[in-house]
Amino acid sequence: MLKHTLFFEKEKLNGILAYASRMNDERQSGEVGYYHLMDTSLALIKESEKFIKDKEHIKKVLLIGMGGSSCGVKALKDFLFDEKSNERELFIIDNTSSHTFTQTIKKLNLKDTLFIISSKTGTTIEVVSLFKLLIAHFKLENSELKKHFVFITDENSKLHQLGDKLGIYSFFVPQNVGGRFSVLSAIGIVPLVICGYNAKGLLEGAKACYEDFFTHKKDEILQKAYHYCTHKNAHINVLFSYGDAFKGFNEWFVQLIAESLGKKQGYKRVGLTPIALIGARDQHSC
């Protein structure tokens, strides 16, 4: 389990209880779904296993996504590299770079590759463009798409509607889960399960963290958040991770902060600027 070490004097709980209370109210309201994904996503594991069961010919999986539909998956792929039960290889394209697309496609064979198109809204322009590019590259007819593609999106989104029309299977993201916080939904669970990563262990770990905070009332995370917020001297937030396995996690951190706290407040450009570094390499160059 995670070990928390604080290198500063803790604040009295009275000073931060209001923040904890707001989070608890939000959790209990049911309006924000990511608090419950460690439970609700267990069914996704079985659904994903059922989907891939008769597709033993699939050796490689290409996930097309942007932002919240890719960053978290990349991080978990790096973390769970030694927690795999099959040999399926997971590739991720999260940019419209022609170089990346070309180099990735060279490694894939249409006959043994499953393409996952992931967009919560179903209208992410970069994802839709890459989807069309894949169809054109492999010269696929509409009638062939259901054999090679699967969608991850909101129920009744335009992507889901297209999937229904073409016979392409769709996994759904809960409506009350925002895209940037969706890694424990179908966004992350489906590709991880299909490629044999230990998704059940991941959800169990998330559940343990949830219980530490909400059930056992451990306050280290709140203490850290409060300290960093009240002691900052600049609008720059630096994450220094020690280990190459954190590269994907660092990218995810930047995406989460930039898309949330990094945005300007009102008309004042005072949002945080996130910077992610890998030690000891980046420390050496400082």
Can you say where each PLM-predicted feature lies in the sequence?
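Acidic catalytic cores of enzymes that act on phosphate-bearing nucleotides/polynucleotides
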Residues: 30-33, 51, 197-201, 211-286
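Short, flexible loop segments at the rims of nucleotide/cofactor-binding pockets, characterized by
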Residues: 38-44, 91-94, 215-217, 275-276
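Glycine-/proline-rich flexible loop or hinge segments
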Residues: 30-38, 58-62, 282
